[in-house]
Amino acid sequence: MSGPAETAAGTATPAADVVLGRFTEPTRAWFTGAFEAPTPAQLGAWDAISSGRHALVIAPTGSGKTLSSFLWALDSFVREPATEGTAATRVLYVSPLKALGVDVERNLRAPLVGITQTAAHQGRPVPRVRVGVRSGDTPAAERRRLQQDPPDILITTPESLYLMLTSQARAALAGVRTVIVDEVHAVAGTKRGAHLAVSLERLDALLDTPVQRIGLSATVEPAAEVARFLGGTQPVTVVRPASAKRWDLTVTVPVPDLTDLSSPAAAHDLGPGSSTGGLGDEGAVTGGSIWPHVEERIVDLVAERRSTLVFANSRRLAERLTGRLNEIWEARAEAAAAAEHPDAVPGFRTPDPTGFHGPAQVAGQTGTGSGTVSDFARAHHGSVSKEQRAIVEEALKTGQIRCVVATSSLELGIDMGAVDQVIQVESPPSVASGLQRVGRAGHQVGEVSRGVFFPKHRGDLVDTAVVAERMTAGRIESLRIPANPLDILAQHTVAAVAVADLDAQGWFDLVRRSAPFATLPFSAYESVLDLLAGRYPSDEFAELRPRILWDRENGTLAAGANGDILRQVATGGEFLLKTEMAAGHGGVSGRYEKWRQNAFEYAWTINKATGLEK
């Protein structure tokens, strides 16, 4: 098996004129007119991608990774314009976050419009490139439209790709040439990644020529392991130029002594393990709480900046903190208004200078608090509705809102150009997560990413200091690809046989081409098939019922209990088995009798058999 070929950090990047010379004139003219020069990450990526190689691009936030992965594919629509009546998806972009996918769709508009206008100005055929998004938020009508009239570029999630491969929608993927996996580090070390790896192999099996795979990441270690995840048995070029990203990290304790909190315990304490004193066991030595100090200081920092993104480690904390920030901001505004206008009606406050006025929030989408509507801070997490998330994201991008309190829902890759400060409450879950989160500030090439950390107690202070030090040094945790997750194998097996009968050996070979299953023993594979075929039935575990039919003699796998003839229910009529009887296998169960060791149950009672030939 070929290993990944790595372009090591510090290796000379290809000359810009040489690489740009591989693009068509409209694409080259648009890029040179829009940007001063390509970044090292872009040059390395385009060199590998234009040569037809699989590529893993590792570069800090704000290095132009999205364009590095897409531009060659966009240029292909100029080189080879789609002909009328041959609509097919050429580029498949897979994002671990729905919000990231929507963001990429928005960011593709500029190059698409620019290249199209340049081509028209030069008198060349104007490519008509359509972009579609399919995720769990996509309405059923839109999913049907995407299936019937596939877009040129499809943005989706790992789960939606899996569902497409297991339905008639897979026909829309028959023309895919390029797959881009963004934020690949977020899935490579998880079972979700193993699930995606098998989906990519199933996609290749649909095509005459395997797709070109491109992975993007800002924070990943070790690179060779992630390259193996991306390519499976195929070699991958790792593009990893020397990083010039600058960080400004500060760990802030808003009180002189964490062991002597002067503020009384607050009823709005946010600590998940809080005692009466407002702190967890690690630091509760007096009756005070750290949270009032943290909240006041966060409001101070937000007021000093254009737009701030605050990260919390749970949805509960995000909601409660959003409410408290709004309460503090509103109280300050009312106090300032009262001082400036002593004769004003009580409750009068000066309007927020940002001018952002979103729709009235509903419970569960603004953070708890006094119940008043404030334009100062908004919450963003998975429980917030799709429409509200979109409003908050757009307001944050354009600088129309001062502060957004989010969980990991805004951690990955989303372009937040207006954000100039990130605040992390409590230690981030990992060094990689910390880099991703702080990287949301200063997201443009050459800008400094500024992050402020607020530990909640002494133990958290130690964790935060260590994480911040490792972030500065770039010492990211190493990930490991899960080895042979059999539950993922079982899920994909059932899904694949629901589409068509499989050759058992061929399916084993396909699964083994994915990195997570590269060492899968055939004995373990057979055990999974035994389980799915119902070899271990139990009245106590309904999930052990047969799901597939395994013909051991012919080595085939077919749809089982959920889609097979045996699961059909006779509702007062006769169920004819004459066709199966003529096959010559004998017995009422027809051809199914020959599959010894397969356990199954009838969904009806046989009263009599008629028309049997002697």
Residue ranges of predicted features:
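N-terminal pre-P-loop "Q-motif" helix
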Residues: 36-51
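Interdomain "pre-motor" coupling segment immediately N-terminal to P-loop NTPase/helicase cores
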Residues: 1-17
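Short, amphipathic alpha-helical interaction segments positioned at domain boundaries
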Residues: 558-568
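C-terminal catalytic histidine-bearing segment of alpha/beta-hydrolase fold enzymes
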Residues: 572-614
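Helicase motor core with emphasis on the C-terminal RecA-like subdomain
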Residues: 14-19, 23-29, 50-56, 60, ...
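Short conserved micro-motifs at the rims of enzyme active sites and ligand-binding pockets
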Residues: 261-262, 561, 588-590
